[in-house]
Amino acid sequence: CRFLLVGEQGRGDEIQFIRFAEWLYQQGAIVDVLVSEPIAGIAASMKGVRSVLASMPPGPYDYWSHMLRMPERMNLDLLMLPIVMPYIAASPHKIDYWREQIDVVSQATEPKKSRRIGVVWAGGPHTALDRFRSVNIETLKPLFSHPGTTWFSVQKGEHECDSEGLADQFDLHTLGPFIEDFTDTLAILETLDLLITVDTSVAHLAGAANLPVWVLLPAYAEWRWLTGRTDSLWYPSMRLFRQRELGEWKSVVDEVRVALTAWCGIKTTQLAAPM
């Protein structure tokens, strides 16, 4: 059968729920997806998608559904997650391009055997709950000072240049102004060791590609992250760090810093004092 899967809501929602195109493909459907323009490039990388559309096609289709109605239509339960993984991928030529660019910008400062970490600290400012999920970049300074790490901002939007003001203090490189779309961001993430981000579309991007990602969540987190968990059923490569008190990020950053120590294999006594 011919099936049209229609994106809706935010970009993160589209990235999260476009996975159902793969499920439909596994059931034997010929699947086209209608998504917002920023998502089109990564949607085109999916095995189960025949065509990626930016405007409503004339048809004909046997069936269609909005993405967020698919869980109901397929009787989804938590045991079925994550459905398929990974379901998006960066193009090899873009990965090669960005690996070369990152090598060039970091070679002067990056210490030997340093871990390369991407960072995003702010979501779209027009989202209703953005004031709860986004942080000031200054809040993350204790992470940037962690030994054995080199940082790359993949922040986009009005805050994409905030990191430039910290470049003289930390091994922190600003890539946002050079990123054209999600295919660039995904290729960059493929070259890094880890992404640390607040709850944004880039968190979904890394998770959908099954890349290591740590997400800082507000106490008032969205339904998709469930409650009381440090993992995500939607994204096996994701680790969640939750606020205990709404608006209080220090304890979250402290927890992430401790996790970085373990992840980097550095003894606590070797750590520089948080700033």
Question: Which residue ranges define each predicted feature?
Answer:
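Catalytic machinery of carbohydrate-active enzymes
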Residues: 1-275
